[in-house]
Amino acid sequence: MGKLTLLLLAILVWLQYSLWFGKNGIHDYTRVNDDVAALQATNAKLKARNDQLFAEIDDLNGGQEALEERARNELSMTRPGETFYRLVPDASKRAQSAGQNNR
């Protein structure tokens, strides 16, 4: 009976070692779970960005407001009868902000 108990104990130790330290053991399992969580977070961010880009594409394809906004912002276009005003800070504020940017 003693040899059988010793054999079963040796098998139990070997199985526990395999479970904790072997290939596909607990350490590998937790590492893979951490990797999966990080990749899922990255995928969620990328999906949100893709959804935003698809919404912008739909707006550009069908909506005139987005086209008008881009023309106004990027090309400085105005409608007939409108006057475009550009506000330029005075020289002292420009010099002060330039001094802060050089720091």
Swiss-Prot record:
Pfam families: DivIC. The keyword Nucleus does not apply. InterPro entries: Cell_div_FtsB, FtsL/DivIC. Residues 28-71 form a coiled coil. It is a single-pass type II membrane protein. The chain crosses the membrane at residues 4-21. GO terms for cellular component: cell division site; cell septum; plasma membrane. Residues 22-103 are periplasmic. It is found in: Cell inner membrane. Keywords: Cell cycle, Cell division, Cell inner membrane, Cell membrane, Coiled coil, Membrane, Transmembrane, Transmembrane helix. Residues 1-3 are cytoplasmic. One of its GO terms (biological process) is FtsZ-dependent cytokinesis. The keyword Membrane applies. Its main location: membrane. Belongs to the FtsB family. Essential cell division protein. May link together the upstream cell division proteins, which are predominantly cytoplasmic, with the downstream cell division proteins, which are predominantly periplasmic. HAMAP family: FtsB. Part of a complex composed of FtsB, FtsL and FtsQ. This is Cell division protein FtsB. The gene is ftsB.
